[in-house]
UniProtKB/Swiss-Prot annotation:
Binding site for substrate: 33, 57, 79, 136
Reactions catalysed, as given in the entry: shikimate + ATP = 3-phosphoshikimate + ADP + H(+)
Family note: Belongs to the shikimate kinase family.
Name of the protein in question: Shikimate kinase
Cofactor note: Binds 1 Mg(2+) ion per subunit.
Stated role: Catalyzes the specific phosphorylation of the 3-hydroxyl group of shikimic acid using ATP as a cosubstrate.
Upper classification of the organism: Bacteria, Pseudomonadati, Pseudomonadota, Gammaproteobacteria, Pseudomonadales
Gene3D superfamilies listed in its UniProt record: P-loop containing nucleotide triphosphate hydrolases
Single GO molecular function: ATP binding
Amino acid sequence: MVNLILVGPMGAGKSTIGRLLAKELHLAFKDSDKEIEQRCGANIPWIFDVEGEAGFREREQAMLSELCATDGMVIATGGGAVMRDGNRQILRAGGRVVYLHASVEHQIARTARDRNRPLLQKPNPGQILRDLMDLRDPLYREIADVVVETDERPPRLVVQEILERLRKLPPR
């Protein structure tokens, strides 16, 4: 089976929904950020501090390339993975891409206490999330086979909608 690749902003539910999708489809689940952390033996904020965002993005591209080279997985990506053209090409070629859309208000509510998100460890995280959404939303949509809203919806219903919509797509 072709990979299912989840993209979207932080707080959209990529990891939660990815695990449920993988269980439903009897596939492996991989979170690209967690895979990077395991490979490096360090968490994402540390990598950002030491290598900067550019260094992290290099690691991210290598990890996405590796994960997408194998079929039969559900892959949750980091929110900024779409920022590099090379990553977008890897993701499009790597499987069916599902954009989990969440409003900025829901992102704020879901990420408010999370200290593991380097881009939000600055004053005014709400404005940062709005700016990131303005920048990234067109890129998520550019590569998505399916766009699904996650606001105010239980993860199981989101999973059901994803599966129904993917079934209606023509084979690749």
